Amino acid sequence: MFNLRNFDVIVVGAGHAGTEAAMASSRMGCKTLLLTQKISDLGALSCNPAIGGIGKSHLVKEIDALGGMMAKAIDYSGIQFRILNSSKGPAVRSTRAQADKILYHETVKKILKKQNNLLILEAEVKDLIFKNYSVVGVLTQNEINFYSRSVVLAAGTFLGGKIHIGLKSYSAGRIGDKSAIDLSVRLRELSLRVNRLKTGTPPRIDINTVNFNNLLIQNSDTPVPVFSFMGNVSHHPKQIPCYLTHTNEKTHEIIRKNLDKSPIYTGFLKGLGPRYCPSIEDKIVRFPDRKSHQVFLEPEGLSSIKVYPNGISTSLPIEVQEQIVASIKGLEKSKIIRPGYAIEYDFFDPKDLNLTLESKLIKGLFFAGQINGTTGYEEAASQGLLAGLNAALSSKNTEGWFPRRDQAYLGVLIDDLTTQGTEEPYRMFTSRAEYRLSLREDNADLRLTEIGRKLGLVNDSRWIRYNQKVLNIQTEMNRLKKNKISPISPDADILKKLYNINLIKEISMSELLKRPQIRYQDLQSLESFRTGIVDLEAIGQIENEIKYAGYIKRQSEEIERHLKNENTFLSSIYDYNKIRGLSSEVVKKLNDYKPISIGQASRISGITPAAISILLIHLKKESYKHTL
């Protein structure tokens, strides 16, 4: 063994969590080492070829607002962009993009290679190095020590990973890559709570064997959306469609007859899978009355021959997979070029983490991504960014940062994980956020970019553009308030004729925009509108802020009330056994979870309002004692 180098931060794993962690820490000026089994797999889209979706896109926008790279990577590699829930309110509208897998990986690789303070090496980590209950480095399989002030573990499905196809299984981190067995064994020797989860993927189909005739076509939206606040439609490669087909009774019968060959239904596979992304076997068993299920045929790239049949994730034997595929319209003669499979892997109880994603048990050790019990690229990447920036702050002996639930979807994600934990892969949805009208996609930069700048994550060009956008929005909103329309003006006649609006008194453009049938583009057709702005992103924010001003104000007032509990800290309480009046169940949960505030304590299952009242009384008494 020999001492090769010293670093501020070491990141283990280079998937979506690891790459964002490494970028965040290096952008903050920390000397960072990113270790991966294969540099050729940096930021690989291991499963579905898509970024975004309901709730997930909000995380991508927040990563971007904090200077992360996921939004930029998908803008340069996305081959189909759509806005989901476009007919619904702005709180739940979500961008989703199909990715060219090769272009996405190449973009991530290019961004990482340009980053200062970052060294990327191929090496498998087999152990952590400790000193006085703190992590101080890692040991690789080839017996090299790397030392650091903090370590981020972002190993994805590689820790104890086991692939299942039918009743056969073998160790692997994903198909074609070996599992990190030694590190898994070592981590299980520590005082960390470990369990198993599983996820799955469908077979890949040769695009040349698919009959797309008579299938429903899905093109990109017009205008084509962008993800990054620094992005532009011109960054997108060529746009191509996806197609929709369905399973049928024949498909379902094939699956029912072969459930005895499923590792899930024969007990070979113990880990719980994602509730909201079930295998086709699960769908057939859980919804026996359904006559069909959607299958989206998603190309994996402009030059790839692989099609991803989204909706038929399976771990049945390959010969059964072939029967399933052949039973589906358009796929009757299709050829499988890679089988579907399930993968079981280690995850660590996220309740053992602080809100900064640092272990409560081992100083300097941070966890990010699927090993925290989440599923999805976006959930992993956002955790990676948070873990990376906090690993950087920790290496500088600086207090960590995390967003609150009212500040970001990332705040919701982290609070849910560390407060409630999870027994199945956790996926983000807009429904998980109680303040979702304030946490829209379009205002992620307004919520987080200033914070990112203070942390050292946001560069000068992004900061200049952000400030110009804020100025444009404020200037235009003020102009709309001052710009009036008279009931005797030609514009009043236009409003009556086109929108059935009968003005009886002077009205501002801002008041007019509050009406549900009026959009900003409608105002532009009025003579008194004069010159507005052309930034579609800013226009969207202006519309939302004006149209939903009343709701946003009420939500802001609610947030203010809740902040009182979030800012009432419990750090002075070391042992809840000493507080009289708490039940033994409540004491055990509080001692186990160690919530940082009254707000977090109130979200722990089983912590009653009465228990919260006792805690508040205790804090008040302690505060009074200190004033004497």
From Swiss-Prot:
<dbReference type="GO" id="GO:0030488">
    <property type="term" value="P:tRNA methylation"/>
</dbReference>
<protein>
    <recommendedName>
        <fullName>tRNA uridine 5-carboxymethylaminomethyl modification enzyme MnmG</fullName>
    </recommendedName>
</protein>
<feature type="binding site">
    <location>
        <begin position="273"/>
        <end position="287"/>
    </location>
    <ligand>
        <name>NAD(+)</name>
    </ligand>
</feature>
<comment type="similarity">
    <text>Belongs to the MnmG family.</text>
</comment>
<dbReference type="InterPro" id="IPR040131">
    <property type="entry name" value="MnmG_N"/>
</dbReference>
<dbReference type="GO" id="GO:0050660">
    <property type="term" value="F:flavin adenine dinucleotide binding"/>
</dbReference>
<dbReference type="GO" id="GO:0005829">
    <property type="term" value="C:cytosol"/>
</dbReference>
<dbReference type="InterPro" id="IPR002218">
    <property type="entry name" value="MnmG-rel"/>
</dbReference>
<dbReference type="InterPro" id="IPR026904">
    <property type="entry name" value="MnmG_C"/>
</dbReference>
<dbReference type="InterPro" id="IPR020595">
    <property type="entry name" value="MnmG-rel_CS"/>
</dbReference>
<dbReference type="Pfam" id="PF01134">
    <property type="entry name" value="GIDA"/>
</dbReference>
<keyword id="KW-0963">Cytoplasm</keyword>
<dbReference type="InterPro" id="IPR036188">
    <property type="entry name" value="FAD/NAD-bd_sf"/>
</dbReference>
<dbReference type="InterPro" id="IPR044920">
    <property type="entry name" value="MnmG_C_subdom_sf"/>
</dbReference>
<dbReference type="InterPro" id="IPR004416">
    <property type="entry name" value="MnmG"/>
</dbReference>
<dbReference type="GO" id="GO:0002098">
    <property type="term" value="P:tRNA wobble uridine modification"/>
</dbReference>
<feature type="binding site">
    <location>
        <begin position="13"/>
        <end position="18"/>
    </location>
    <ligand>
        <name>FAD</name>
    </ligand>
</feature>
<comment type="function">
    <text>NAD-binding protein involved in the addition of a carboxymethylaminomethyl (cmnm) group at the wobble position (U34) of certain tRNAs, forming tRNA-cmnm(5)s(2)U34.</text>
</comment>
<comment type="subunit">
    <text>Homodimer. Heterotetramer of two MnmE and two MnmG subunits.</text>
</comment>
<keyword id="KW-0274">FAD</keyword>
<keyword id="KW-0819">tRNA processing</keyword>
<dbReference type="InterPro" id="IPR047001">
    <property type="entry name" value="MnmG_C_subdom"/>
</dbReference>
<dbReference type="InterPro" id="IPR049312">
    <property type="entry name" value="GIDA_C_N"/>
</dbReference>
<keyword id="KW-0285">Flavoprotein</keyword>
<dbReference type="Pfam" id="PF21680">
    <property type="entry name" value="GIDA_C_1st"/>
</dbReference>
<dbReference type="Pfam" id="PF13932">
    <property type="entry name" value="SAM_GIDA_C"/>
</dbReference>
<keyword id="KW-0520">NAD</keyword>
